[in-house]
């Protein structure tokens, strides 16, 4: 039985996706037989994310519109289609080392908690340097993701929405920091590791997100909006 689905968004990251697939294939049978991977292209204008056999089930979806910073919708789609009890939600520029993945799959943890990871940065010379934990990488059960409500797609188009999701995580679960780490890949190592198409922390983010929050508050007993964007399946491979 497969235990975990690794979920990450894609946006014009062909080189980084190839590196992800290379690292996943290298896990070995003991990990791959428990793993599935879902990639969601959140509207890349330069072509679709390309799939290939990676040794475990791989599914790729693509959102049909190109919206600034729409990785929240991508994560919702991935979680919706996952069939494993556990999810690992992260970004495409974060690699899960074999030791971390083996520890995740080989350890029974309370399903009532949500888990975060330490982080290292991959340097150009291959060394790893300590880096602050990623604020939007999560290990949790699919059932708990549903209870939290997933990501609220009202905030589509804004950078920094991970804080809103984290606030709701704190309302439903204890967050536990694990000693294992993820590896951040900067653009100095892989040029398309992360997007340069859209700016981060723009004025529209500072002013727009509070307006969405205020409008949402008027709804009273609101629930997060999910699966609001059209999408299609691009690729599926059993292994």
Positions of PLM-derived features:
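C-terminal catalytic/acceptor-binding lobe
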Residues: 19-20, 163-239
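Short beta-strand-to-loop element that shapes/binds the nucleotide-sugar donor at the catalytic cleft/hinge
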Residues: 115-129
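Short, well-formed alpha-helical segments that are part of the catalytic scaffolds
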Residues: 13-28
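Glycine-rich, basic loop-to-helix element that forms the pyrophosphate-binding segment
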Residues: 65-81
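Acidic donor-binding/catalytic loop of UDP-sugar-dependent glycosyltransferases
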Residues: 92-107
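Short aromatic/hydrophobic "clamp" motif used to bind/position activated sugar donors
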Residues: 87
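Acidic donor-binding segment of Leloir-type glycosyltransferases
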Residues: 24-65
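Donor nucleotide-sugar recognition loop
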Residues: 149-167
